[in-house]
Amino acid sequence: GYIEIPVTLIKEKNIKSNMYLSLLSKTLGIPSLQKKDIQKVTTSINDEKKVDFDNNWSCGVSNALLIFINKKIWQEQYESKDQDLGLFKFSSLEKIKANNNWTASLPKKENINIAPLKNGDKIKVNGNTIKVSEIFRNYGIKNVLKEVWPVVSIGDEVYWVPGIRKSDSLIDYEKSGKSNIITASIEKS
């Protein structure tokens, strides 16, 4: 459900970019990209907007990468409670060497929910409650990637945005020394 390609490889209209677009269409399950599909890709690159294709794939630009995401596949993975969510892999650990935004010590007996961003999701950071969408914007996570990036909540409270930010509640809990360590990583293949 995730494909990325550097924008520079397909921005120029030449034989190489056509080859990459052809490879891309096969990977997306589109027999061949039609003119309208190529225009959608061009619009996404030039206007930095999200565009949708007919087969559940969407694309957008983030950090000079053209990113294609199949939200249906991601949603199925979220619903199956799988440990792999798109390009994110979650695992439990007994100990860690370094504590950073890719690890979190979460309360063991709580119902931990990992899901994509929902409208109105907020996180408490440095005593202030701010929208998670604002956190994404500040870290350059936009378009299609923002729609599938995991958000970890306990009840209605957002505790952790993996790789980006921990809430004040999570930071306080981690200071207690209790451990139910979950680590997140990005694994591209």
What are these regions (language model features)?
Residues 1-189:
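AMP-forming adenylation/ATP pyrophosphatase catalytic core
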